């Protein structure tokens, strides 16, 4: 990350959010602070991805902010393209997964159905296959941080705050280490705030029950 950033911009800061890990993430990250422009934020417990993202965003100060997962599957070569689109006037440039052939058919079906439900019942367009990997202007970050929601569905909020957006298709690289712990349970837990906050489905269900 440091090498890519130095090639593209004159000044930057890296913020690592340790979302209540039990391994050596915090210790090893802190050890790098003397060598790199790095800050490490350690949460008191595992709050989940959405809250970890917001905790990091609230501590940024730059004119532009990039969100990047720690699994290193998203090629940093796309940062240059994102910056070019920002120079064209786009205030948020986000990555979209080009294909999902490495996933099971059940997970692909669940994801497709989930986004279909979201977009049928929502006034805000929520792109399917969009990643959290994105470059955002300071105004976008400030707008997200000003929202009062505690249980957040970030992919919905990215679209809800508005601004000019641009999608960039990417191919994911293999995970650098380990295996993903984000399975169906994580998808379901993440999806509930999305369905309840960004669609009319809960109202329709309760209306149907009342009838």
Question: For the regions a protein language model found, what residue spans apply to each?
Answer:
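Short aromatic/hydrophobic "clamp" motif used to bind/position activated sugar donors
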Residues: 65
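Alpha-helical bilayer-embedded segments of polytopic membrane proteins, i.e.
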Residues: 192-211
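Acceptor/aglycone-binding surface of glycosyltransferases and processive sugar-polymer synthases
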Residues: 41-45, 49-59, 76-157, 173-192
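Catalytic metal- and UDP-sugar-binding loop of GT-A-like glycosyltransferases, i.e.
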Residues: 43, 68-70
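Short helix-capping segments at alpha-helix termini
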Residues: 5-10, 33-37
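A conserved acidic beta->alpha catalytic loop
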Residues: 18-27, 72-73
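Short beta-strand/loop segment that forms part of the nucleotide-sugar
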Residues: 2, 10-21, 41-43
């Amino acid at each position: 990350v440091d090498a890519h950033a130095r090639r593209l911009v004159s000044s930057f800061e890296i913020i690592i959010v340790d979302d209540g890990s039990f391994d050596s993430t915090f210790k090893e990250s802190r050890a790098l602070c003397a060598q790199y422009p790095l800050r490490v934020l350690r949460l008191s417990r595992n709050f989940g991805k959405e809250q970890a993202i917001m905790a990091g965003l609230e501590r940024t100060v730059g004119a532009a902010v990039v969100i990047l997962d720690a699994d290193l599957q998203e090629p940093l070569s796309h940062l240059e393209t994102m910056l070019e689109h920002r120079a064209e006037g786009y205030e948020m440039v986000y990555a979209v997964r080009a294909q999902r052939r490495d996933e099971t058919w059940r997970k692909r079906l669940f994801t497709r159905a989930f986004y279909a439900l979201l977009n049928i019942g929502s006034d805000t367009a929520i792109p399917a296959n969009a990643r959290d990997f994105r470059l955002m202007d300071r105004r976008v970050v400030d707008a997200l941080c000003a929202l009062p929601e505690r249980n957040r569905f970030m992919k919905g909020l990215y679209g809800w705050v508005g601004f000019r957006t641009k999608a960039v298709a990417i191919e994911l690289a293999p995970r650098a280490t380990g295996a993903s712990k984000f399975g169906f349970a994580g998808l379901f837990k993440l999806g509930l705030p999305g369905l309840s906050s960004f669609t009319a489905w809960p109202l329709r269900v309760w209306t149907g029950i009342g009838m």
